[in-house]
């Protein structure tokens, strides 16, 4: 399910059932781009909205994402019901120009260390989530930086737009829905390019551009094979 401040009137979500695989919480920095993509993946791959909970209600700041993830996780933990406790919690954050990016990563790592179990997983994108989309069309490790009044994230979107328009005939917008099924035929290309870019960061020591989104996507594509408690 998607956690929202608004009342959910969707019948399918109200009647969704817990399935016998991991319970996972995904907290997104954006309110539209990442949740829209992940919700369309969940629906396309027929994953339960009870098992895969997605929220974009954390405000557009990496440290807020981590704080919100901890809050939701601890609310579940306080229920003292092992069957409803999240097995994994993912925090999606963009590097872009966020001043508290490193602080968010540090807080997540510290929380996990103190808990003595692997609770929070940070999924970083440099400069932004749209680089994951770019990986569906081509491999590129050319740095994506601020240009004039454009943020690095805006610059990444500008690189994505002509490729998007060639395939789909329309400009890319952050609030597009059903993105995953549109790109599904290119998913193996995206996984290959994203892995290659992340591997290259190890030798170049430059994270821009790269993303860890493929780690989350592969996990979700294989989640039905995960052994868990009922």
Regions of interest found by a model, annotated:
Residues 21-31:
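N-terminal "first-domain core" detector
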